[in-house]
Amino acid sequence: MKLVIASVISLLSFSALAAPEGTLSVHILNQQTGLPSPGVQIELDKQQGRAGSISPPVKRMPMGGLNRSIRRRRIVEPGVYKVTFKTGDYFKSQNMNTFFPVVPVIFNVTKQNQKLHIPLLLSQYGYSTYRGS
């Protein structure tokens, strides 16, 4: 029994020493209601080269509110990225018009395996974003 416990502890310790994985998490808060905005689709793209072209999306996923993480090895590399929040369908589902049907946020990853958080505070006619923690 002691051998089994020691083996499990050693495996847990080994996994803690494994290479860290960078993450990007986002959340979308509707400032008019004070509630998360479920169903907003996001895309993550990495900029390639100096011409400013954007590679095909790395990840697409519907948003269910707070702290949805996008985890892919390609996002942990330093570079310029763009996360696009497709807000038009969300507002349409709420029977509301919006001036910003798409909100692109371009940001710079400066270190390998960084943990990043990008909040989006959203209303029909405006938005705000910042580097979260």
Residue ranges and their predicted role:
Residues 67-80:
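Short Pro-Gly-centered beta-turn/loop motif in secreted/extracellular proteins
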Residues 41-45, 82-84:
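Beta-strand signatures of extracellular beta-sandwich domains
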